[in-house]
Amino acid sequence: MIQVESALQVADNSGAKKVACIKVLGGSKRRYASVGDVIVVSVKEALPHSKVKKGDVMKAVVVRTAKEIRRNDGSYIKFDTNAAVLLNKQGEPVGTRIFGPVARELRARNYMKIVSLAPEVL
């Protein structure tokens, strides 16, 4: 469950390390985002000479949440951290690698590029 001001790690090699959610997309009253949802983020920490700079405002898709997700078979999955992958204007990942596992729910949301780059899909 990600809301405005939530801090997330960046799970790609775009150069950003930490981001903060500044808006949850999908309706004016929408408060929370879960795995597979698109949010607007501000880069809070970035590596020097990288594709993104501190202060950049971008869209990102949530790939891991510390809050558990209930699946249709009744099982739950949760991760240790909140993490997101930065997206460009066309909705494609900015980075060329994904770090750490991602949730299977991304496949249902048609983020095939992220699923194929991820080392593990849980």
From Swiss-Prot:
Q: Which InterPro entries match?
A: Ribosomal_uL14, Ribosomal_uL14_bac-type, Ribosomal_uL14_CS, Ribosomal_uL14_sf
Write down the SMART domains for this protein, in alphabetical order.
Answer: Ribosomal_L14
Q: Which key words tag this protein in UniProt?
A: Ribonucleoprotein, Ribosomal protein, RNA-binding, rRNA-binding
GO annotation, biological process = translation
- The organism's place on the tree of life at top rank: Bacteria
**UniProt-listed PROSITE patterns:** RIBOSOMAL_L14
> GO cellular component annotations, sorted alphabetically?
cytosolic large ribosomal subunit
Q: Name one GO molecular function term.
A: structural constituent of ribosome
**Which positions are tagged coiled coil?**
none
Classification via CDD domains: Ribosomal_uL14
Family membership noted in the UniProt record: Belongs to the universal ribosomal protein uL14 family.
Q: How does it assemble?
A: Part of the 50S ribosomal subunit. Forms a cluster with proteins L3 and L19. In the 70S ribosome, L14 and L19 interact and together make contacts with the 16S rRNA in bridges B5 and B8.
What does this protein do, in the record's words?
Answer: Binds to 23S rRNA. Forms part of two intersubunit bridges in the 70S ribosome.
Q: What is this protein called?
A: Large ribosomal subunit protein uL14
> What is the native source organism of this protein?
Oleidesulfovibrio alaskensis (strain ATCC BAA-1058 / DSM 17464 / G20) (Desulfovibrio alaskensis)
